[in-house]
Amino acid sequence: MHKKYFIGTSILIAVFVVIFDQVTKYIIATTMKIGDSFEVIPHFLNITSHRNNGAAWGILSGKMTFFFIITIIILIALVYFFIKDAQYNLFMQVAISLLFAGALGNFIDRVLTGEVVDFIDTNIFGYDFPIFNIADSSLTIGVILIIIALLKDTSNKKEKEVK
C-alpha cells in the first residue's frame, strides 16, 4: 500500500528551508551593512547585503499590500494543490513544500520589516544575476521540480494512450 501523503517529509522540508532562510538573513542583516560585499568564489559568487521591497529585479517595488494578499492566496493554493493534486506523489509534495517554504520565508521578511533580505550575488557567464536568498532558491527549485513532474506525468499519460 502506498502512502497518500508524506506529511512528515513535507513539513520537515518546509521547516528546514524556512529556518535556514531566516537564520541566513538574520546573520546578513546583523553583521553586514547594506551594500557590503565579500567574495566567496572569484568572478562567480559574492555575499552582498541587499534589501528588496519588491519582487525579483525590483519589480513592483513598494507594493507591500499586493505582496501580502498574493502571498496568502498562493500559500492557500499550495495547500489545496498538495491535498487535491499531489496524492501518492512524493516528488510533487516535495516541490510544493519547497514553493510553500520559499513563499513563507519572504512573506515573513515582508511582514516583519517591509522588505526582503537578499545576499546571494552571482555572476553567471558574465551576467550579473539579481541578488537573491534561500527562499528565492527554494521557490526556483520548487518550480523546476513541478515542471519536471508535470512533464513526466504528461509523458506517462501519452505512453498509456499508446498502449
UniProtKB/Swiss-Prot annotation:
Its EC number is 3.4.23.36. GO terms for cellular component: plasma membrane. It comes from the Bacteria. Its main location: membrane. It is found in: Cell membrane. It is an enzyme of class 3 (hydrolase). It catalyses: Release of signal peptides from bacterial membrane prolipoproteins. Hydrolyzes -Xaa-Yaa-Zaa-|-(S,diacylglyceryl)Cys-, in which Xaa is hydrophobic (preferably Leu), and Yaa (Ala or Ser) and Zaa (Gly or Ala) have small, neutral side chains. It is a multi-pass membrane protein. This is Lipoprotein signal peptidase. The gene is lspA.
